[in-house]
Each structure stands twice: as structure tokens, then as C-alpha cells.
Amino acid sequence: MKLKTTLGLLAGRSSHFILSRLGRGSTLPGKLALQFDKDILQNLAKNYEIVVVTGTNGKTLTTALTVGILKEINGQVLTNPSGANMITGITTTFLTAKSSKTGKNIAVLEIDEASLSHICDYIHPSLFVITNIFRDQMDRYGEIYTTYNMILDAIRKVPTATVLLNGDSPLFYKPAIPNPVQYFGFDMEKGPAQLAHYNTEGILCPDCQSILKYELNTYANLGAYICENCGCKRPDLDYRLTELVELTNNRSRFVIDGQEYGIQIGGLYNIYNALAAVAIARYLGADSQLIKQGFDKSRAVFGRQETFQIGDKECTLVLIKNPVGATQAIEMIKLAPYPFSLSVLLNANYADGIDTSWIWDADFEQITDMDIPEINAGGVRHSEIARRLRVTGYPADKITETSSLEQVLKTIEAQDCKHAYILATYTAMLEFRDLLANRQLVRKEMN
């Protein structure tokens, strides 16, 4: 082993040992190690079978559900559970890996779309999974085709890897890559072809650029699409969700390829994440019983429908970061059969996306149909989100606003509702979790 690699390992692991005692250390150890040896990740990852999960929405939950299943097979699975998904976080993940008791080293990693190509200079995945691509952080990623091309550039570096795609997205039709491709998607009862419910990305037919119609439209531009001009249609699915048995604000049950599964996480959008996890697990050889066992042990992860108690109140923290994701979160809380207070926390740091105009494309109008006695607008851009919420027609006198997340927490405590939902952008979610962790209301995790 080269001296620079040895020094990198020493610096990275020593810093992780110290920082982990403080509930920190998911990126700095990797950053220190890379300063000594820029190729250290290649050395650390060389003996692993690697599954990469990327895409706009659903990376963290898809990864967590997959890891839960694969632990039933392998016992030990390397992953980055706190969502540190750039090269420093991925390097830290490998730096701190424990030896597998089975002798088989498996890593399931969520990786940032813009970082993936650079990271693939050092790792060689056997499977890439793309959950979806929607408009997100335009100041960082650009428009959706730019993001998609970033991902395809990474995949082309590993032409032997299989690529698992969301077949319900027209964007993923016939990708320009040499890799073998498989598709997952919803294959429930179809109806007459209609325009999408809402298509904020403006996706057109990938062959002739005509407007697409849908025989089944799950949400946004996803579903069984067809072009009536040229006949282009969704590809055949390798992994099919054929029935939605139950859908609530905190759980769902569904049938995939003849087997019924359930997760203790609400919302239609999260069923796509479960479907992707089933597809990954089956590709890697897991049977339905092991998949069920993994799902039975699953829980909401790191700000993705994470629940906690404040006194006698049951609270749920939900990450939002773009129009489609926010709209789906709103659809999910709409399923709650009880009144609840709502807090919406909007920051505009680099990790959130500095441009917050996306809030005007999210369907906040639905809140006027819910039993929400009070709303709290918080975060750096509290006045912006408060204005957006007032525009829905929700009574302005029932909206409080503050930049202080500590004050938001105190307000939730004082409100009468026994249930609360907190929708938060990424850095607001991290800050709010820190407040909760300091009160020991949630488990402190590295961030």
C-alpha cells in the first residue's frame, strides 16, 4: 500500500472515530482521506459488488428498503444511510466499512446525480438504478435533459453494468447506452388515453416530439404513455406492480408480479421506491419471502416520513425539494383521517437550491381541502412560503411565520392538534432534526 493511501486511511478513520461520538462525520473523514490520496476510493471499493441508486426523488428510501432486504441475505450491507451522496460521503462510507461475515461484500449506495460521473471514475457498479428525473435545483442541475445526460455519461463508463429504469418515465425510453436495460413500472388497469394530470417538465414523445397521452397516469408524467401520432409507447416491463391494495398516509400494500407486499410508509410516490427495491432484490436473487421480511423491518428514514413524539403529539417530518416531490407529499398528508397542524420550512442554501420559485409549481392549493387548523411558515425564506400558502386561499390569520426553527418547534408544542406534519427543504430538515435530536426526540444521525 502506498504511503499516501496509508496516511489517507489514518486521517479519515481517526477523524471518523472522533466525529462519530458527536453524531457527525459522514463527509469530513472522506474529505481528509481524499486530500492525501485522490484515488483512495478506488482502492477501498475494489472488492465490492456495488448497486448505485440515483435520480431526483426517492434515492434515500429506495436505498434503505433495498438494504433492508439484502441484509436478510447477506447480513452486512454497506450503505450511506444519512444521504451523504457526493464523493466525500461515499469515500467516508467505504472508509468506515465493517468486514462481511459471509465473505461477500455488497454496497448499495445512493449517489447524487451531478456527482455520479466523477465517482464512477473510481467505482465499478454492477447495477445502476434510476428512480426518476424531475425538475430540481435548476441553479445546480439545469434542466432535466442535462441531469439525464450527466447520469448517462456515468453509466457509459461501466458498459458491463445492468441499468434498471423506471419504465413509466418517457424520458427513459431507449437510452443511448451500450448497457443491458431492464424496466419496472405500474401495470394496473388501463383506461382511454388522456393527457397527463400535470406535466411540469413538458415531456414530449421521445420519437416524434408530439404530446403524449396516458392510458394509466400515476402522477406527474409517469405511467403507461402512448403517442397517438407515431405509436411510440412505454416499453415492456420486467417488474410490474399490478394492484394497489391499500394506500394511506402512513402505510401501503400492493402486488408486484403476483406477490403482495407492504411498507409502513405512506404515499403513492413511495410505492415506486418499494417497486424499485423489489426489482433490485429480485435482480440480485432474493425471493419474495426475503423481500417481505426486509419490508416488515423497514422504517421511515432520515427526514422521509420520520415520526417522533412531542409530548402527546405525533409528528411527521417530510423532505420536500421540488414541485413534483412537494405535490406528492401534499397528496400523502391529504390521506390523513384526522386534523393536523402543518409546518412548511423553506431554506435556500446550496443544498436546497437557491432558486425557490419551484414552490409556485407545487400544488399547495390542496391544503384548502384538508382539516388544518393552523399553519406555521418557517426557515430562511419564511415570508416566501407564507405568501405562497396565502395565495391558496387558506386564511391568512391562521398562518404564523418565523425564520427561527426553534420557534416553529415551540409553536407546534403549543398548538392544540394531536398530529403535526412538517414539510421541510433539505437544510431546514437537517436543522430541525438537530433540534429534535438535542431534545432526544429522534436518534442523532450523521449529517
Residue ranges and their predicted role:
Residues 76, 126-127, 161-162, 180, ...:
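Residues at the starts of beta-strands that form the adenosine-phosphate
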Residues 1-15, 19, 24-26, 202, ...:
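ATP-dependent carboxylate-amine ligase
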Residues 62-63, 118-119, 139-140, 173-176, ...:
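Short glycine-/acidic-enriched loop or helix-start segments at secondary-structure transitions
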Residues 66, 70, 90-94, 274-284, ...:
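Buried hydrophobic packing segments
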